[in-house]
């Protein structure tokens, strides 16, 4: 499958550009390759974005950008914003007002037979047509709100899924209620007036600062206080009331555990793999010497000093729980209920990482339990019910829907071990995001899963009387609870819910540097 991208777009400035300002813009455009090639694998440079032409028109820079799969043309356009804003803001006090795409043609080449099956396909947000072995998607008049909603990549994913759809995902075969069905909801009693993107506001106020790693942030004292307040409430009002006991789970997970979980079958591209170093001090000395002389990191040399991948950074947080019980015999009349909140969870979102709600590094309170099927399903229901009660106590607007991507089934097409599955593998609780106007969208803050015998079989766990054993887990995404809370309450501490204010007492201040946070021009 080959993808090509051809974009006509524009960057809108706060005022018309002088000749000197145009020259400054052209300097950035001449160095665009270094901007576009960041993160592109070696040998794939020709598939990154390239500027085909550009012209100035008043306060607008019009651009034609083409690309292959890597740093897709719309990503290239977005990447230009920051260096242009920095250069023009610093030297000419000109800001970037917005980014727009006038016309965007994406061509997906595949086998002609596969393409033919998609004739007449309706793809949300764009026009789609099939010509021979090509599916052509055309987007028109795309603004920043659509780009933030990731509609382009979602449309491509939709088409690719349709092309590859030889059989349904296992989730859809197993689930007795159609994924996406809303099973409960709550409307806020107060009038919600805040309608800005919490990521934009948090960054502007200095509550967060971008970290160099993709999908990572530095969280400063004010937002950290909110993190801790919500975490404490979830532990006090939900987790401990149900009866979970706290443990400290490892976060560096051996690959063989992921294999036994079958996680490597479903989402192998969604993890950070860890390579231990070879214990060869002399070779590392060469690496250090070369780095000191060249003033850059010799990556190729470093690769040769690393062993094969042996671990992943925990992508689900519950992995150690199943390993704890491997080969053990339990009594389902004495179920085990643990929870962990001891560190970060890591998932590689790739190009999907955006804002504070979809990050590669995030905090969660993870509950995991084992017992009889009846106990496991009852406990899952409690983990949802108590979370709903907390949201209502805080007057947070939410809904609960049947999930379409339980982590242990995601991406998998079949199961050949005779596993017992629940009628509903996953429920997902979402907090409403009022700043997204085009559709009613929520951030998933709680994921409540029942696994049936999936992990019991994989880790050879038995009951001493031969009775059925199931497992379940619920993750409370603290990072996303924070995003949902700020999206509905805003950043004025006086407007926050009394329960949160009582927890925090006095909101810490943002550290003030000479150069940060940036002041409004």
Swiss-Prot record:
One BP term from GO = selenocysteine biosynthetic process
InterPro entries reported in the protein's UniProt record: aa-tRNA-synt_IIb, aa-tRNA-synth_II/BPL/LPL, Ser-tRNA-ligase_2_arc, SerS_tRNA-bd
Under catalytic activity, the entry for this protein gives:
tRNA(Ser) + L-serine + ATP = L-seryl-tRNA(Ser) + AMP + diphosphate + H(+); tRNA(Sec) + L-serine + ATP = L-seryl-tRNA(Sec) + AMP + diphosphate + H(+)
Which EC numbers characterise this protein's activity in its record?
6.1.1.11
Q: Which Pfam families match?
A: tRNA-synt_2b, tRNA_bind_4
Q: What superkingdom heads the lineage?
A: Archaea
> Where is it predominantly found?
cytoplasm
The entry lists its GO molecular-function terms as: ATP binding; serine-tRNA ligase activity; zinc ion binding
Q: How does activity depend on temperature?
A: Thermostable. Fully active at 80 degrees Celsius.
Swiss-Prot/TrEMBL cofactor(s): Zn(2+)
What is the uppermost EC class here? ligase
**UniProt entry tagged with the keyword Nucleotide-binding:** yes
Q: Which key words tag this protein in UniProt?
A: Aminoacyl-tRNA synthetase, ATP-binding, Cytoplasm, Ligase, Metal-binding, Nucleotide-binding, Protein biosynthesis, Zinc
- Compartment(s) where it occurs, according to its Swiss-Prot or TrEMBL record: Cytoplasm
- Cofactor mode of binding and number, as noted: Binds 1 Zn(2+) ion per subunit. This ion is coordinated with 2 cysteines, 1 glutamate and a water molecule that dissociates from the zinc ion to allow the coordination of the amino group of the serine substrate, which is essential for catalysis.
What family is reported? Belongs to the class-II aminoacyl-tRNA synthetase family. Type-2 seryl-tRNA synthetase subfamily.
Question: How the protein assembles, per its UniProt entry?
Answer: Homodimer.
Record note on domains: Consists of two distinct domains, a catalytic core and a N-terminal extension that is presumably involved in tRNA binding.
Its annotated function is as follows: Catalyzes the attachment of serine to tRNA(Ser). Is also able to aminoacylate tRNA(Sec) with serine, to form the misacylated tRNA L-seryl-tRNA(Sec), which will be further converted into selenocysteinyl-tRNA(Sec).
Q: What name has this protein been given in UniProt?
A: Type-2 serine--tRNA ligase
* Organism lineage: Archaea, Methanobacteriati, Methanobacteriota, Methanomada group, Methanococci
């Amino acid at each position: 499958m080959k993808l090509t991208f051809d974009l006509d777009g524009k960057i809108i400035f706060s005022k018309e550009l002088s000749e000197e300002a145009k020259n400054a813009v052209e300097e950035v455009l001449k160095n665009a390759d270094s901007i576009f090639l960041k993160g592109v694998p070696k040998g794939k440079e020709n598939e990154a974005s390239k500027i085909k032409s550009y012209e100035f028109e008043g306060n607008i820079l019009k651009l034609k950008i083409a690309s292959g799969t890597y740093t897709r043309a719309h990503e290239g356009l977005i990447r230009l914003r920051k260096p242009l804003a920095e250069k023009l803001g610093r030297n000419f006090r000109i800001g970037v007002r917005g980014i727009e795409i006038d016309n965007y043609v994406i061509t997906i080449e595949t086998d002609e037979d596969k393409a033919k099956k998609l004739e007449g396909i309706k793809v949300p947000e764009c026009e789609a047509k099939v010509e021979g072995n090509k599916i052509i998607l055309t987007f028109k008049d795309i603004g920043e709100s659509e780009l933030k909603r990731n509609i382009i990549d979602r449309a491509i994913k939709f088409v690719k899924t349709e092309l590859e759809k030889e059989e349904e995902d296992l989730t859809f075969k197993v689930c007795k209620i159609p994924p996406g069905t809303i099973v409960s909801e709550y409307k806020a009693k107060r009038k919600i007036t805040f309608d800005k993107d919490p990521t934009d506001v948090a960054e502007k106020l200095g509550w967060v600062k971008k970290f160099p790693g993709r999908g990572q942030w530095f969280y400063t004292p004010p937002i950290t206080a909110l993190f801790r307040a919500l975490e404490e409430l979830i532990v006090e009002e939900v987790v401990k009331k149900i009866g979970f006991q706290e443990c400290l789970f490892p976060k560096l997970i051996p690959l063989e555990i992921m294999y036994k979980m079958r996680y490597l079958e479903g989402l192998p591209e969604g993890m950070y793999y860890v390579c231990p170093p070879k214990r060869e001090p002399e070779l590392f000395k060469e690496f250090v010497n070369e780095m000191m002389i060249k003033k850059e990191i010799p990556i190729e040399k470093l690769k040769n000093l690393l062993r094969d991948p042996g671990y992943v950074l925990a992508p689900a947080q519950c992995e150690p729980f199943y390993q704890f019980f491997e080969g053990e015999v339990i009594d389902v009349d004495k179920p085990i209920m643990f929870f962990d909140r001891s560190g970060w969870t890591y998932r590689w979102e790739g190009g999907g990482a955006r804002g504070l709600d979809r990050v590669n590094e995030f905090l969660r309170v993870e509950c995991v339990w084992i017992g009889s099927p009846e106990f496991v399903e009852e406990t899952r229901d409690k983990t949802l019910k108590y979370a709903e009660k907390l949201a209502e106590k805080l007057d947070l607007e939410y809904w609960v829907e049947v999930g379409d991507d339980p982590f242990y089934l995601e991406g998998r097409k079949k199961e050949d071990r005779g596993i017992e599955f629940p009628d509903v593998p996953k429920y997902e609780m979402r907090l409403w995001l009022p700043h997204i106007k085009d559709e009613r969208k929520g951030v998933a803050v709680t994921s409540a899963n029942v696994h049936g015998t999936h992990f019991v079989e994989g880790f050879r766990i038995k009951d001493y009387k031969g009775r059925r054993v199931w497992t379940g887990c619920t993750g409370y995404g603290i990072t996303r609870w924070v995003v949902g809370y700020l999206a509905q309450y805003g950043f004025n501490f006086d407007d926050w819910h009394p329960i949160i204010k009582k927890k925090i007492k006095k909101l810490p201040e943002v550290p003030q540097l000479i150069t940060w946070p940036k002041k409004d021009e």
